[in-house]
């Protein structure tokens, strides 16, 4: 961050971790009502993430399981499995839209209630969806995947000066065989290349949580360490 740039940072109370049952979670939270895109992207480079209007970063007293991960767009090479995913989804139409819709929420509700009924986001509600996904000072884009007009999947995506940030993805569980979660990331990578972006930020890799350990499959990738961003080419951190 430039030496002339200052932001206020608060710290949350300890609370039960949403991802690891035996851990307590604590967050650094940016205390600014508005962030311009350049500052927001710089905070991403420092390991922060967006949830709704909030910008946060884990600062847990006894755990460092959350590892910020990004994929360099120009270096990315899909694996054989990812190529098969692309092949079986070549009949899908990709749309980029700038507004959320009732159709998006209906799909989100179905996804949460069927796939994450054992998690903290269940049961889904419109208020929860809007608070989590939307942002007043940086409206996201929405990557849609459609099959003959039917909405199958959505990736909520922030567009920054030199990167895309994957905020959240949801899809129709009735089409599990299509690997739509993976397809959405591959689509974001392709869109980032078309936009001449340098990175796609995928969020936090958490090896100990089976639902949060997929990000390292998109290679090569970089993880944020105490020494800066570190390059990896294998599936293990």
Curated annotation (Swiss-Prot):
Organism: Shewanella amazonensis (strain ATCC BAA-1098 / SB2B)
Molecular function via GO: arginyl-tRNA--protein transferase activity; leucyl-tRNA--protein transferase activity
Predominant cellular place of this UniProt entry's protein: cytoplasm
Reaction it catalyzes: N-terminal L-glutamyl-[protein] + L-leucyl-tRNA(Leu) = N-terminal L-leucyl-L-glutamyl-[protein] + tRNA(Leu) + H(+); N-terminal L-aspartyl-[protein] + L-leucyl-tRNA(Leu) = N-terminal L-leucyl-L-aspartyl-[protein] + tRNA(Leu) + H(+)
GO CC terms: cytoplasm
Similarity comment text for this entry: Belongs to the R-transferase family. Bpt subfamily.
Protein name: Aspartate/glutamate leucyltransferase
Function comment: Functions in the N-end rule pathway of protein degradation where it conjugates Leu from its aminoacyl-tRNA to the N-termini of proteins containing an N-terminal aspartate or glutamate.
The keyword Acyltransferase is annotated on this UniProt entry: yes
SUPFAM superfamilies, sorted: Acyl-CoA N-acyltransferases (Nat)
GO biological process: ubiquitin-dependent protein catabolic process via the N-end rule pathway
InterPro entries, A to Z: Acyl_CoA_acyltransferase, Asp_Glu_LeuTrfase, N-end_Aminoacyl_Trfase, N-end_Aminoacyl_Trfase_C, N-end_Aminoacyl_Trfase_N
Enzyme Commission number(s) from the entry: 2.3.2.29
Keywords: Acyltransferase, Cytoplasm, Transferase
Protein's gene: bpt
Compartment(s) of residence: Cytoplasm
């Amino acid at each position: 961050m430039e030496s002339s740039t200052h932001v206020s940072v608060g710290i949350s109370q300890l609370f039960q971790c949403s991802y690891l049952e035996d851990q307590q979670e604590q967050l650094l939270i940016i205390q600014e009502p508005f962030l311009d895109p350049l500052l927001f992207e710089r905070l991403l480079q420092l390991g922060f993430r967006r949830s709704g209007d909030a910008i946060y970063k884990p600062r847990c007293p006894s755990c460092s399981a959350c590892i910020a991960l990004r994929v360099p767009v120009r270096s990315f090479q899909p694996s054989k499995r990812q190529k098969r995913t692309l092949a079986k989804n070549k009949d899908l139409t990709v749309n980029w839209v700038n507004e959320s819709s009732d159709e998006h929420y209906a799909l989100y509700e179905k996804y949460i209630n069927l796939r994450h009924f054992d998690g903290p986001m269940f049961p889904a509600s419109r208020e929860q969806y809007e608070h989590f996904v939307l942002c007043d000072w940086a409206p996201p884009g929405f990557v849609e995947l459609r099959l003959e007009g039917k909405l199958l999947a959505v990736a909520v995506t922030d567009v920054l000066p030199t990167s895309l940030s994957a905020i959240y993805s949801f899809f129709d569980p009735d089409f599990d065989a299509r690997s739509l979660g993976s397809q959405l990331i591959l689509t974001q990578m392709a869109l980032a290349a078309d936009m001449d972006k340098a990175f796609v930020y995928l969020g936090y890799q958490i090896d100990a949580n089976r639902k949060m350990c997929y990000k390292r499959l998109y290679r090569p990738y970089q993880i944020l360490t105490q020494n800066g961003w570190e390059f990896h080419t294998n599936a293990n951190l």
